[in-house]
From Swiss-Prot:
Entry protein name: Protein Tax-1
Record flagged with keyword Phosphoprotein: yes
Presence of the UniProt keyword Lipid metabolism in the record: no
UniProt gene name: tax
In-chain residues carrying the UniProt-annotated modification Phosphothreonine: T48, T184, T215
ZnF (unnamed) residues: 23-49
Taxonomic placement: Viruses, Riboviria, Pararnavirae, Artverviricota, Revtraviricetes
Induction (free text): Down-regulated by P30II.
Region (Interaction with CREBBP C-terminus): 312-319
Amino acid sequence: MAHFPGFGQSLLFGYPVYVFGDCVQGDWCPISGGLCSARLHRHALLATCPEHQITWDPIDGRVIGSALQFLIPRLPSFPTQRTSKTLKVLTPPTTHTTPNIPPSFLQAMRKYSPFRNGYMEPTLGQHLPTLSFPDPGLRPQNLYTLWGGSVVCMYLYQLSPPITWPLLPHVIFDHPDQLGAFLTNVPYKRMEELLYKISLTTGALIILPEDCLPTTLFQPARAPVTLTAWQSGLLPFHSTLTTPGLIWAFTDGTPMISGPCPKDGRPSLVLQSSSFIFHKFQTKAYHPSFLLSHGLIQYSSFHNLHLLFEEYTNIPISLLFNEKEADDTDHEPQVSPGGLEPPSEKHFRETEV
């Protein structure tokens, strides 16, 4: 898993931030209220303090007695956790427990797929720009998971206490067999624990494949998954995008939509933006962290994330691309009269974004 150095405190609560699955040499001890030990560490979604012999859950701050109680929800055990500063951290926002999913959303999920040769390439992270952050408190970790013929993004920013919960969608599609981009080979047990915590804390509706985690402790919704593979290496370009996903808000109010690749040879797991980006970088595909580091989107704008439902399925091409690039004929494999083959998988891997 990727490890991003320079861990810092959160911009909102002064709370430490984490990257899912990594070991962080520093955390707040619930007893002392500070960094009481240099040996303090976090691993496998747990944090321990060797000086005070205490173990707690860094995601929601709940103190636990042993790893066996990891999935048991409980109130904070120490008065130091109930201060005015930590109370805001330990209190998740209210969410809808039973969000309504329009049938059109589930139907639209089957339209496009970022499969390459029948499976998700684990090297898709190489196609994205280098992660750069203006502040150490913002550490996005995106779980790109495939659902049927489409990609669904679980935007799990930091996975550190509840400053992340407003950023989570109310409906989470998770296919543990098809994790890609930044996180790969996540153990089923860890994913189950994470989804269970999200379900408890936020009330989000977890949707899993019918044959995934059959003995899970919580009761997720089940939905069939039909896997289909694209013959070409990348998603085709379309003049009118019909892509379920998330809508972001730029600092100037223009939208940024997650969708398939804009041009042949460009990465598919990126975010497409409006004309606001063209004036800055003459491009349409950049990772949210890159846009964040250049001041194009704000941290507060992440709270405007919402699921892309029926009213957003048809997006005019003028909102996303320049007129000269509004060409939907370049997604077909181009074979010259000499019989040359189209670009191979190695070509895509070496293409600069």
